[in-house]
Amino acid sequence: MPRRPDPDLENQILNAAQKLWKKGGEKALTMRAVAKAAGTNTPSVYRRFRDREDILRAIMQRIRLEIAAQVEAASSPEEGCERYLDYASSHPREYELFYQQEYELFYSPRSIRAGAKPAGRPVRDVMKRKLTEKLGESPDEHGPLLMALWMVVHGAAMLLVAKTIAPKDAAAARRVFTNLVAMMLRDGCGS
């Protein structure tokens, strides 16, 4: 009797790859290492993913959707910014992949030539909707504010992930961040 394909193998491969990334970054992520960690063989990995970039792209999409879900669960744009920062702080390796590789994996001419399909920008789309719910007008009206917020949130996330802010100063930095986001939303900074 022939073996039946495992319908969850792709998910197992991605889980294994994400764990490898978390432990060792890009150097740890080889097709052979992924296969071993997933409990399968290398040809099985190649049947589901063309190459390492294809696996990274799938992990990246997961991360993008996880961050978007965190922002979506927020009751306000302010809370959405806080949740984004929380995700970056509690998942530094995933956030590292998110900020370092998004353009290269989804939007660069090289990745598009290799068959990558731009996957939208789920975090931006959720935040744009949150801004529209709070401030009214059309979503396109909030482009400059959204850009300004993204710069502040990403900058704060980078400082926390890189451990540039001393642990003793983290609470004060968080208060500054919260106040700055509130001020930007109140004053329409960036519009």
Where in the sequence are the language-model features?
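N-terminal intrinsically disordered/low-complexity leader segments
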Residues: 1-7, 19, 191
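An amphipathic alpha-helix adjacent to DNA-recognition modules
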Residues: 7-18, 22, 27-28, 39, ...
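Append "Primarily bacterial transcriptional regulators
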Residues: 32-36, 45
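Hydrophobic alpha-helical connector segments
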Residues: 58, 69-96, 122, 145-149
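Amphipathic alpha-helical segments used for helix-helix packing
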Residues: 90-111, 125, 158-166
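Amphipathic alpha-helical packing segments from all-alpha helical-bundle domains
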Residues: 107-136, 143-148, 171, 175-186
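Amphipathic C-terminal alpha-helical segment
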Residues: 150-168, 183-191
